[in-house]
Amino acid sequence: MATSNKNMLLNYVPVYVMLPLGVINVNNVFEDPDGLKEQLVQLRAAGVDGVMVDVWWGIIEQKGPKEYDWSAYKSLFQLVQECGLKLQAIMSFHQCGGNVGDVVTIPIPQWVLDIGESDPDIFYTNRSGTRDKEYLTVGVDNKPIFHGRTAIEIYSDYMKSFRENMSEFLKSELIIDIEVGLGPAGELRYPSYPQNQGWVFPGIGEFQCYDKYLKADFKAAAAKAGHSEWELPDDAGTYNDIPESTEFFKTNGTYLTEKGKFFLTWYSNQLLNHGDQILDEANKAFLGCKVKLAIKVSGIHWWYKAQNHAAELTAGYYNLDDRDGYRPIAKMVSRHHGILNFTCLEMRDSEQSSDAQSAPQELVQQVLSGGWRENIEVAGENALSRYDATAYNQIILNARPQGVNKDGPPKLRMYGVTYLRLSDDLLQESNFEIFKKFVVKMHADQSHCDDPQEYNHAIPPLKRSGPNIPVDDLLEATKPILPFPWDSETDMKVDG
């Protein structure tokens, strides 16, 4: 039975639940407040700490530039507050639809898509010229082609408007964190594995830098490095290839040559710079609010065991056995006092088919360790809906990799975990029973705690971002460091 003990509370990991994707529909209507209220009351009774919700750019600013309509979201936030839950708000600058689990379609605003009609290079583009309309290419971050605004200015204005319009919920400390969307699915990555273009697991994916803006950027960078003859890769295969069938990723392939390394560094640095610039804007927008900023990094666990890490490389994570592609991201986030939110916490290597050379457990261990080494908080979520004890136990293990400490804070502890996602299936009786046990175990057998200070999570007013970290300093974090050791299983099993 859950109790309350001061030392054990320091092991408490809060649990949030992701709301359904279409809770506010594409027409900016809060469809079923009564139905949602019933569900939120059940979550609160189960001891859940809060919920996470996508705040869709394509809904809020759909009528025209700077024409924001926050009314439906205000009603939603009001309801969450009445139900006694906290809120994690995602600034969702991507399209909903086309990714794993997308059951509704919410495009980016029509006035932006209209600009894309005459200038399709505003979208990420693969080598064969297919455009991906889920998110604007980083190539237009600083191009004032959106009725005089740059992409970064659009994101910045949106966040400022959110702060102004949601000030009551920021003041009341309902909103505890702002997840800043930085790419497709809200993740800091390229759309390298789009299902709507025919990608299927475990395809290696494709590089997405062939729009004219990124092409020009690459050519300028290559010329500056004294190699004006270098072009973007033309030997990296297509979405559903295996690494060995491509010249780029095969053993001793292009990825290991001077040209290949130059390209991969440029490609991954684009994301670092993109995340850094937008987090800086988010920091300015929410300065002084009692919130944490967070970014999401995708769990690309397939081909992790291959020397080439092909699927990670096409997504923009330049991670090899002798080069850490994640710690530089954590270092960049540290400048903004942010949280790194990672996915696939529920997955075990033994559940994966061997031909995908997949290693989710090692990947989670590497990314979380990298965050902790850079002295930032790390949070996470499951990638796919699961309702079984094995998955819950794996999440609990990752939340406290070295178990609980009965005398104080544990050596390692995640900042929070968000369960994906609220549904009728989750609330089905036997599923919900085990979920309730999961919440209690995440809380280290303690009762639900309303005061985050008791588990060392007091949130001070957001301070200004630290000084800019030069890219060479960020890249020092590519030196591999051994991850922290993980226990083989959790000491707080839901079925133990």
Swiss-Prot record:
**Enzyme superclass (EC):** hydrolase
Its BP terms in the Gene Ontology are:
polysaccharide catabolic process
- Name the coiled-coil region(s): none
Catalytic activity field: Hydrolysis of (1->4)-alpha-D-glucosidic linkages in polysaccharides so as to remove successive maltose units from the non-reducing ends of the chains
Q: Which UniProt keywords apply?
A: Carbohydrate metabolism, Glycosidase, Hydrolase, Polysaccharide degradation
Annotated Pfam families:
Glyco_hydro_14
The record's EC number reads 3.2.1.2
Q: Family per UniProt?
A: Belongs to the glycosyl hydrolase 14 family.
- Protein name (database record): Beta-amylase
Q: Name the species this protein comes from.
A: Trifolium repens (Creeping white clover)
